[in-house]
Design a protein with these regions (language model features):
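Short, intrinsically disordered/low-complexity patches at protein termini
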Residues: 60-61, 109
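Active-site cofactor/substrate anionic-group-binding motifs, chiefly glycine-
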Residues: 63-100
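Divalent-metal-activated hydrolytic enzyme cores
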Residues: 1-55, 81, 90-111, 122-165
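Histidine-centered catalytic micro-motifs
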Residues: 114-120
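Short, basic and Ser/Thr-rich N-terminal targeting/leader segments
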Residues: 56-59, 69
């Protein structure tokens, strides 16, 4: 399954030329600077979709929150075939997400794992509010499945460290 980088076209990000995790991270950070400045690289998506139809060779996996304000591929100015992206509320992973990360590293051979956090995370806010108000997660959200995420986050919250929440 580990295909040679030369088996796939170079994308605008230049990520496939990176040979080690530090180079991949540097290129992702360059892409983030382009995103922040509004000078994204051009992407020929049709060509990239066609050229990756028979295989892929991502160089990183990014674990991020599901927050719609943090579109991973755009945040790092990457394109089709550059990265794997795993998204879950609050970056709290379970066995299936961990299995995907293992696949990316062990089978596909990605060179870097990135855990991308962000400000004003709704899941983190809900977990903090539950701890501060002394609610259990189902009471805090009135959701059926979200508590499984909040229950993993709550023990990590030190109520004494919270200021003016």
């Amino acid at each position: 399954m580990n295909n040679s980088p030369s088996d796939y076209p170079e994308t605008a990000s230049g990520l496939h030329a990176a040979s080690n995790p530090a180079e991949v991270l540097d290129l992702l950070m360059e892409g983030n600077r382009r995103f922040q400045s509004g000078t994204l690289a051009p992407h020929d998506y049709r060509s990239l979709i066609d050229s990756t139809a028979n295989g892929q060779n991502p160089v990183a996996i990014v674990l991020s929150c599901i927050d719609s304000r943090v579109p991973v591929e755009q945040v790092f100015d990457t394109s089709v075939g550059d990265i794997f992206s795993a998204r879950v509320a609050g970056n709290v992973i379970g066995a299936t997400t961990l299995g995907g990360i293992e696949y990316a590293v062990g089978v596909s051979g990605v060179r870097l794992i990135v855990v991308l956090g962000h400000t004003r995370c709704g899941a983190a806010t809900a977990a903090v509010e539950a701890v501060v108000k002394g609610h259990n997660p189902p009471q805090a959200t009135e959701c059926i499945h979200l508590p499984s995420i909040l229950e993993k986050m709550a023990p990590l919250i030190d109520k004494d460290q919270l200021a003016d929440f």
